[in-house]
Design a protein with these regions (language model features):
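Cytosolic-side transmembrane-helix boundaries in multi-pass membrane proteins
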Residues: 1-21, 25, 208-222, 294-333
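Single transmembrane alpha-helix segments in multi-pass membrane proteins
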Residues: 23-29, 37-89, 115-122, 266-281, ...
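Inter-helical junctions in multi-pass inner-membrane proteins, predominant
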Residues: 32-42, 140, 146, 194, ...
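Alpha-helical transmembrane segments within multi-pass membrane transporters and channels
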Residues: 89-132, 286-287
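Helix-loop-helix "hairpin" substructures at the membrane interface of multi-pass membrane proteins
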Residues: 94-102, 108-112, 167-250
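Transmembrane helix-bundle core of multi-pass membrane transporters
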Residues: 120, 124-196, 226, 246-253, ...
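Loop-to-transmembrane alpha-helix initiation sites
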Residues: 124-126, 175-181, 224, 255-260, ...
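Transmembrane alpha-helical segments in multi-pass inner-membrane proteins
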Residues: 235, 246, 250-310
C-alpha cells in the first residue's frame, strides 16, 4: 500500500515536471530567446520570493487549512525590524540581528493565528483573513507608511551577490542570485521533514483527518503550534530576502501583499488531484516554477496582463486535470 501511494505521488510530480518542459519548449518555438541561459537565470531569480512565499502556505495546507495572512506577515516582519533600525539611526547592524528580528515578529504573528485557530476554534481561513486585515492597519497606523531606502551594508552586499551570470543576444547581463542555493536547501530540508520524520507524518495526519489524528494519540494542538511557529520563521526569512533583493523596504509591497492566490495555486497544483497532501514540498516547488515560467515568458512575448491571468488559470486547470487523471487511474488498479 505504501508503495502504491509513493507511485501515485511520483507520477503526479512527474506529470507536472513534464508539463513544465512542454510549456517551456512551446514558448521556445514562439521565441527561441526564451530557451536561452540568460532567460532561464531571469526566471529562476524572479521565482526566489514566490518560492519562499509558498512555504508557509504549504505547511498550513498540509494541515488542512488555508492561510490568508502569510504575505502580510512576510512583508511587515522585515519592514518593522528595518524601520526600528532606521529610526534609531544606527550606523550599522549585523545582518543576523535583522534576520532574527524579522523571524521573531513572524513567530509572534503566527502565535496569534494559532491562538485563534486552536483555542478560539475559528477556521484557519477566517482567522488568518482577520489577522491579515488587522496587521495591514496596525503597520500603517502604529509603525509607518514610509519607505526604508537605506539598508544595512550586509543586506546591500547580499543583494548584489551572484551565483552565475549570462549575457543575452542584445548584450544585456542576467544574474542568477546566490540565494537560489539557500532556497533549494530549504526546500530539501522541508522535504525530509515532511516525508521522513514523525513530525511531518503528524502534519499529514492532521490534514487528512484531524479527529482521527486526535484519536490516534497525536497532540494536535502541539503539532499545530510548532507548524505555525515554523511558518512564522519562514515568513521572517522571506521578508528579509525580499527586501534585500528589492534594496529597500516598504510596509505593504504590492509584489508580495495581495499575491496570496498565486501561492495557494502553486500549492494546489503541487498536491494535484490527490485528497492527501503527501509530496507537497516537491509539488509546491514545481507549482511555483510552472506559474513563474508562464508569467515571465508571457511578459517577454508582450502579452497583456489580463491575458496572462487567463492563460495562467488555464494552465492551473490543465495541470490539476492531468494529475487527477493519474490518481484515478492508479486508484482503479
Amino acid at each position: 500500500m505504501k508503495i502504491g501511494k509513493f507511485e501515485i505521488r511520483l507520477n503526479s510530480q512527474l506529470v507536472l515536471l513534464c508539463l513544465i518542459v512542454i510549456i517551456w519548449l512551446c514558448f521556445g518555438i514562439v521565441n527561441p530567446n526564451i530557451l536561452s541561459i540568460s532567460n532561464t537565470y531571469s526566471i529562476l531569480s524572479s521565482a526566489l520570493v514566490p518560492l519562499m512565499l509558498a512555504l508557509p502556505q504549504m505547511l498550513i495546507v498540509a494541515m488542512g487549512g488555508t492561510d490568508m495572512s502569510f504575505t502580510v506577515i512576510s512583508a511587515i516582519s522585515s519592514y518593522i525590524t528595518l524601520r526600528i533600525w532606521d529610526v534609531n539611526g544606527a550606523a550599522e547592524i549585523p545582518t543576523i540581528i535583522i534576520i532574527l528580528g524579522a523571524i521573531a515578529i513572524g513567530i509572534v504573528c503566527y502565535l496569534i493565528n494559532w491562538f485563534l485557530v486552536d483555542r478560539v476554534k475559528i477556521s484557519t481561513f477566517i482567522a488568518t483573513l482577520g489577522v491579515n486585515s488587522m496587521l495591514k492597519g496596525f503597520v500603517l497606523a502604529f509603525v509607518s507608511s514610509s519607505y526604508v531606502n537605506s539598508l544595512p551594508s550586509g543586506l546591500k552586499a547580499f543583494s548584489t551577490s551572484a551565483l552565475a551570470t549570462a549575457v543575452n543576444s542584445e548584450g544585456v547581463e542576467y544574474v542568477l542570485h546566490i540565494s537560489i542555493i539557500f532556497v533549494i536547501l530549504l526546500y530539501i530540508l522541508l522535504y525530509f521533514m515532511m516525508e521522513k520524520t514523525m513530525f511531518g507524518r503528524k502534519i499529514y495526519s492532521i490534514g487528512a483527518d484531524e479527529d482521527a489524528a486526535r484519536r490516534a494519540g497525536i497532540n494536535v494542538s502541539r503539532v499545530r503550534l510548532f507548524a505555525f511557529i515554523l511558518a512564522g520563521i519562514l515568513c521572517g526569512l522571506t521578508g528579509v530576502l525580499h527586501d534585500s533583493l528589492s534594496r529597500f523596504s516598504m510596509p505593504l509591497p504590492p509584489d508580495v501583499v495581495g499575491k496570496e492566490l498565486n501561492s495557494i495555486a502553486a500549492v494546489v497544483i503541487g498536491i494535484g488531484g490527490s485528497k492527501k497532501a503527501s509530496g507537497i514540498v516537491a509539488g509546491t516547488f514545481l507549482g511555483v516554477i510552472l506559474l513563474q515560467l508562464v508569467s515571465s515568458n508571457l511578459v517577454m512575448l508582450g502579452v497583456p496582463s489580463y491575458w496572462q491571468q487567463f492563460v495562467s488559470g488555464i494552465i492551473i486547470l490543465i495541470g490539476l486535470a492531468f494529475q487527477a487523471i493519474q490518481v484515478v487511474k492508479k486508484a482503479k488498479r
